[in-house]
């Protein structure tokens, strides 16, 4: 294919900026960098490290564009899981697990975090090391700190990144990561690296960047252990709900022991009571018609790694599949999507008009809107799961 027919994403981003505006951004960036370098030196970073770190650093317009557009379109849970727990990823995960079995076992023995969970985080974050990022960390963080949308946060990360270089954990030429400055096999941000990364190889460096994943995988386990991973407790278990289940009890804030849930008819998909691993809630990621999960305290621990509920389910399910488990037994309601902001606002208006207090019409269904929806669902004989979907909106119209 002719090079004239190929237009890279970077070229498109740069092309969207006029030459004067890009030059203006670069000029402002250069001034900001000069000021930051002075601050870094005053905080104890050597001039040698500062000069090496910022050599050839430029304002990266693509990083800014990705930061401003990171609010992705809404993806249904089943579409997300199809992507992150695909059959190819499961196959690759089982291979990575086998190839690193001894290392993962040693890490599990040290930190108490299951090998399959650590391997699943690796798969989710970098496809088992295949996609660790290739953007210079200093350039990405400096650009984002200068841009200002979350300037204070990224300036903190940039200062931490310089300390990492100063400590000799990585050379400047190998100091690459994602557009947001996340680094290595399991995508640590610099401040998390400083606080939680470990030198599992014992060579004096915490090296999460090289092809050897040892320190990265151990660091992930250390992180989860620090946030109270409980040995012998699963992240969650797929369950079967009784036909008369009270959906007002669904949600992670209502917790009971599995034996108590069993007395209400909530059992594993094999029909047996779930063992009493600890207090658990019932999570319905797609409402009454989809997969039901009994989630434990370790669910919240994984959430400390990434606060997305879908991400936690992805890690947990990928770990289960990696360890030899099968897909979820229940099916997803693939024909019933969630709502756009405009549709959610319409749902709120219609609930309010029908006498159910859905709160402010803001297109963001929160607890009040969901409670109003549950009340309406109960009044018309529908499972009161409170999930705002297109089907529910159509019923209200």
Over which residues does each language-model region extend?
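Boundary at the C-terminal end of the N-terminal hydrophobic targeting segment
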Residues: 23-25
């Amino acid at each position: 294919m002719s090079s004239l027919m190929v237009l890279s994403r970077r070229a498109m981003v740069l092309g969207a900026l006029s030459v004067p505006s890009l030059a203006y951004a670069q000029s402002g960036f250069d001034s900001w960098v000069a000021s930051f370098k002075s601050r870094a030196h005053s905080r104890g970073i050597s001039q040698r490290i500062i000069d090496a770190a910022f050599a050839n650093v430029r304002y990266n317009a693509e990083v800014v564009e990705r930061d401003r557009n990171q609010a992705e379109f809404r993806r249904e849970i089943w579409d997300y899981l199809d992507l992150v727990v695909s059959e190819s990823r499961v196959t690759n995960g089982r291979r990575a697990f086998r190839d690193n079995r001894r290392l993962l076992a040693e890490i599990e023995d040290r930190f108490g975090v299951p090998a399959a969970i650590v391997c699943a985080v690796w798969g989710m974050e970098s496809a088992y090391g295949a996609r660790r990022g290739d953007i210079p960390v200093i350039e990405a963080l400096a650009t984002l700190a200068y841009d200002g949308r979350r300037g204070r946060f990224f300036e903190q990360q940039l200062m931490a990144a310089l300390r990492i270089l100063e400590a000799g954990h990585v050379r400047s030429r190998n100091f690459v990561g994602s557009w947001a400055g996340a680094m290595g096999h399991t995508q640590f941000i610099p401040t998390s690296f400083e606080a939680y990364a470990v030198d599992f190889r014992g060579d004096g460096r915490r090296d999460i960047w090289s092809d050897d994943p040892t320190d990265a995988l151990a660091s992930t386990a250390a992180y989860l252990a620090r946030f109270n991973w409980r040995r012998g407790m699963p992240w969650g278990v797929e369950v079967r709900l009784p036909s008369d289940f009270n959906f007002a009890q669904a949600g992670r804030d209502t917790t009971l022991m599995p034996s108590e849930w069993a007395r209400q008819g909530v059992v594993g998909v094999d029909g047996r009571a779930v063992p009493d691993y600890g207090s658990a809630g019932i999570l319905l990621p797609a409402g009454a018609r989809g997969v039901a999960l009994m989630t434990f305290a370790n669910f919240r621990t994984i959430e400390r790694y990434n606060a997305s509920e879908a991400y936690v389910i992805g890690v947990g399910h990928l770990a289960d599949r990696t360890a030899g488990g099968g897909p979820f037994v229940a099916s997803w309601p693939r024909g019933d999507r969630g709502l756009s902001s405009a549709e959610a606002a319409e749902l709120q208006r219609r609930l309010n008009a029908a006498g159910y207090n859905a709160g402010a019409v803001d297109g963001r269904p929160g607890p009040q809107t969901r409670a109003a929806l549950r009340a309406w669902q109960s009044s018309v004989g529908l499972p009161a799961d409170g999930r705002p979907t297109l089907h529910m909106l159509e019923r209200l119209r």
